[in-house]
Curated annotation (Swiss-Prot):
Protein's name according to its UniProt entry: UPF0102 protein MSMEG_2508/MSMEI_2448
Pfam families attached to this UniProt entry: UPF0102 (PF02021)
HAMAP family per UniProt: UPF0102
Annotated family: Belongs to the UPF0102 family.
Recorded GO MF terms: nucleic acid binding
InterPro entries: Restrct_endonuc-II-like, tRNA_endonuc-like_dom_sf, UPF0102_YraN-like
Organism: Mycolicibacterium smegmatis (strain ATCC 700084 / mc(2)155)
């Protein structure tokens, strides 16, 4: 099955799977995926226990060439929305973290075998 035949939802799910594996390789533990509330959705919530950091990750998956301006995809409005969602999620947790971080992970699935990953840490 070629990458071009993937639906948007399948492409997004594939990208999130790649992102979760990438975070695990960095020593981060995924706490939640596709967490939703009435105000929106957080793609991945992960924890870096070594530094007491909780990381809210926005995943952007692209097929074909180029990342299409990954940094530009995360507008100040989007960062504000992620912050608001993060606050709602945090309010429901028993645990407390010393540091909060917002990351963006771009995943490009092309004709090559391995997806390419760009990880922008601390965008917000």
């Amino acid at each position: 099955m070629g990458m071009s035949s993937l639906t948007r939802a399948e492409l997004g799910a594939l990208g999130e799977e790649v992102a979760v594996e990438h975070l695990a390789a960095l020593g981060l533990k995924t706490l939640a995926r596709n967490w939703r509330c009435r105000y929106g959705e957080l793609d991945i919530i992960a924890e870096d226990a070594a530094t007491g950091t909780v990381v809210f990750v926005e995943v952007k998956t692209r097929s074909g060439d180029g990342f299409g301006g990954l940094a530009e995809a995360v507008t100040p409005q989007k960062v504000r929305r992620i912050r608001r969602l993060a606050a709602i999620w945090l309010a429901a947790q028993d645990a407390h973290w010393a540091v909060l971080r917002i990351d963006v992970i771009g995943v490009r699935v092309g004709r090559s075998r391995d997806p390419e990953i760009v990880h922008l840490a601390g965008v917000g």
